[in-house]
UniProtKB/Swiss-Prot annotation:
It comes from the Eukaryota. Residues 1-29 have a biased composition (Pro residues). It comes from Taraxacum officinale (Common dandelion). O-glycosylated; contains pentose side chains at some or all of the hydroxyproline residues. Glycosylation is required for full antifungal activity. GO terms for biological process: defense response to bacterium; defense response to fungus; killing of cells of another organism. This is Peptide ToHyp2.
Length: 35
């Protein structure tokens, strides 16, 4: 059998028995200015 990938699946929920982990934004978005 092929070895499982070291990196977690891109879509949460594919790994059985593991809860989906939240992915925080790498860069905080600035507040949107009103038009």
């Amino acid at each position: 059998l092929p070895k499982p990938p070291l990196l977690p699946p891109p879509v949460p929920g594919l790994a059985p028995g593991l809860p989906p982990l939240p992915v925080p934004d790498p860069v905080p978005h600035p507040p949107k200015k009103p038009p």
